[in-house]
């Protein structure tokens, strides 16, 4: 009983410090578009990875998302956006900041980059706002 009260206080303190951020409606719509694009790669045997990364981009800004990739696999990083953000670019960097050569796709408010790493490790996906618009984006990725 002596340890019960401090344990309860600790649990309440920790649970109060955890802040969960729900996706906005714009991010949900962007994720829908990203999943639609990623689904097209499913025709080539790619599986959509659980999880997603959403956020907001200002004009001429970028977001970096860290991912762990494995040599021997192939990946597609698919991004959907919402108005007024109409055009994004997707690029990939290794852990030292070198830009990787990717196969690129862009159509309207969707973009994707395909990549097959030679080395396993941490990479960074850059989602770049191209133009003067800002808005929400969502990234999902597929692998095989």
Annotate the PLM regions:
Residues 1-7:
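Positively charged n-region of N-terminal signal peptides that target proteins for export
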Residues 2, 18-22:
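N-terminal targeting/docking segments
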Residues 7-16:
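Bacterial N-terminal signal peptides
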Residues 8, 35, 40, 48, ...:
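Generic detection of intrinsically disordered/low-complexity segments and helix-coil linkers/edges
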Residues 22-46:
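Predominantly extracellular/luminal regions of secreted and cell-surface proteins
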Residues 23-25, 29, 52-136, 142-144:
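Acidic, Ser/Thr/Pro-rich low-complexity intrinsically disordered segments
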Residues 41-57:
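Glycine-rich phosphate-binding "P-loop"
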